[in-house]
């Protein structure tokens, strides 16, 4: 409901509330919301009220429920995991062509990278996400990450390759296309 409240406050007229498990179609796209968990950051669960004022500061957002999304288009599927945690039974048996996987705070979840690879049947392409300076305005500045973050991204790729050696891991750069 929090996302719906922010969307409506932002002027989005047509909002569909989902809870996970639905199958939706939007023209050539299919979208399946998948129930999930937020990273183990210790952030309290809260709801964003319907009377929220936008734009919001980053610290005004709350964890009000987490979903992941399986998107289909033109015979291909992409799984978007936007936070470093998941419900394994919800992912078991999914076989996406591409998995977009959050890397931030994954170290708090036991065997995070390999458990995802096993649950998804070792997808051929993994894109890292949730590693940039996401509190900065959208643009090139978001990719100004430090040496520690770069080393963590290399470690993520090594984790994936340790249990899924054929998987290609890409660290995306904003506004650069990636062939899938």
Give the ranges of each region predicted by the language model:
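Short, acidic/turn-prone active-site loops that include or flank metal/cofactor-
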Residues: 2-3, 20-23, 36, 103-107, ...
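Short loop/turn motifs at secondary-structure junctions
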Residues: 11, 30, 95, 121-122
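Active-site glycine- and acidic-residue-rich loops that bind
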Residues: 14, 101-111
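Binuclear metal-ion centers of metallo-dependent hydrolases, dominated by the metallo-beta-lactamase
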Residues: 16-23, 93, 118-180
């Amino acid at each position: 409901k929090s996302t719906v409240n922010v969307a409506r406050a932002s002027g989005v007229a047509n909002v569909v509330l989902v809870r996970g498990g639905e199958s939706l179609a939007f023209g050539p796209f299919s979208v399946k919301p998948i129930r999930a968990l937020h990273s183990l950051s210790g952030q309290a669960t809260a709801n964003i009220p319907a009377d929220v004022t936008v734009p919001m500061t980053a610290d005004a957002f709350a964890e009000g429920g987490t979903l992941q999304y399986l998107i289909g288009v033109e015979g291909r599927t992409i799984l978007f995991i936007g936070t470093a945690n998941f419900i394994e039974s919800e992912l078991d048996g999914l076989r996406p062509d591409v998995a977009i996987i959050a890397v931030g705070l994954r170290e708090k979840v036991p065997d995070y990278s390999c458990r995802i690879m096993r649950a998804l049947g070792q997808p051929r392409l993994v894109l890292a996400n949730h590693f940039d300076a996401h509190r900065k305005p959208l643009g090139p500045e978001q990719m100004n990450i430090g040496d520690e973050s770069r080393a963590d991204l290399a470690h993520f790729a090594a984790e994936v390759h340790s249990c899924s050696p054929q998987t290609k891991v890409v660290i995306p750069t904003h506004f650069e296309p990636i062939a899938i």
